[in-house]
Amino acid sequence: MSDAHEIEEANAGFYRAFEALDIAEMEHVWAHDEHVRCVHPGWPLLCGWDAVRTSWQTIFENTGEMRFTLSDVTVNMGHDLAWVTCTENILSEVADRVAVTAILATNVFERSSAGWRLIHHHASHIM
């Protein structure tokens, strides 16, 4: 499998975990290091795996459903780093309210002995 295909699969795994609202799947996608970072729309920068994991747990506990259709997907690669940019077209149910929104996202992956792991997710509302 080519590196580009591995990155596409790693990115798809992130969105599968997100849609499943499954913290165990999300744990598998991410590196568990202090250098990981995450910015959810409207949230401050979260630093380190513990803070990032807690944020996903909170989101999953308060979300009834989350469905993604990705568009404008681009994959860029370096030697041991790769990044994916995309538009997340989201249908969600949070606190019994259904919403449809579009979010710009950047996902940065780092190659490790375990494969490509997410080290940075940044998602911002399109204004």
Segments the model singles out, each with a brief description of its role:
Residues A31:
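Helix-to-beta-strand junctions that scaffold the AdoMet/dcAdoMet cofactor pocket
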Residues M1-E25, H35-M127:
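A beta-strand edge to alpha-helix "cap/lid" segment located at domain peripheries
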